[in-house]
A protein has these predicted regions:
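A short helix-loop-beta-strand connector motif used in the catalytic cores of GNAT acetyltransferases and
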Residues: 64-78
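Short, surface-exposed helix-loop/turn micro-motifs enriched in polar/charged residues
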Residues: 49-50, 71, 101
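Acyl-donor (CoA/ACP) binding surface of acyl/acetyltransferases
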Residues: 1-45, 76, 80-192
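Conserved GNAT-fold acetyl-CoA-binding loop/helix
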Residues: 42-64
Length: 192
């Protein structure tokens, strides 16, 4: 996997689909839908970022993302319900280790849609894209200890729990323990 190939693919981010969702480029038009969950303290409790203070904050963030897409430096999709057209979260690659053909997946979902298997479905599609289109060997997800629902999404997608990085990340001024789950291409192929 080469940085240039990933940048080329994501500068014109492909649209992906699942049974219930469309995964597409995040747009400035998603501002209201994103703000709906991004301002929620419960949503950001297990994330590295703080709640958006107002709709202007969300709009500025989405404007910034457009420049990152254009330069091939942003690797997230908007999760859009096929039925309603509503954007309900994001999912994508948060970092790449190009030398070792490894990437990390991250995600966030509007809490109104929790408990419906949405992230399991969406993360599964992103994992498939990583192995089939980006030639990855390993895909991992990290979660703040205590985020049981997120770990469950990972395990339902065939990821194995590999351990905890004690004090592994400074988040909002506090060192947090970070759980790591991962799947290898060979294990994904067996699962299929």
């Amino acid at each position: 996997m080469k940085r240039e190939n990933v940048s080329r693919i994501f500068s014109k981010i492909p649209t992906l689909t699942t049974e219930r969702f469309i995964l597409r480029r995040i747009s400035i038009d998603d501002s209201d839908d994103m703000y709906e969950y991004a301002q929620n303290k419960e949503v950001t409790k297990f994330l590295t970022w703080s709640p958006h203070e107002n709709k202007g904050h969300t709009f500025e963030y989405l404007t910034y993302l457009q420049t990152r897409y254009a330069s091939g430096e942003f690797f997230d999709w908007a999760i859009v319900c096929k039925e309603s057209g509503k954007m309900i979260g994001t999912c994508g690659f948060t970092r790449f280790d190009y030398k070792n053909d490894c990437a990390e997946v991250g995600y966030v979902l509007n809490p109104q849609y929790h408990g419906q298997g949405i992230m399991t479905e969406v993360v599964g599609r992103v994992i498939r894209f990583g192995f089939e289109n980006l030639a990855l060997n390993r895909i991992e997800c990290r979660f703040i200890e205590g985020n049981i629902a997120s770990r469950r999404v990972m395990e339902k997608n065939g990821m194995q729990f590999e351990g905890v990085l004690r004090g592994g990340m400074l988040i909002k001024g506090e060192y947090k323990d970070i759980g790591v789950c991962a799947i290898l291409k060979k294990d994904f192929s067996k699962k299929e």
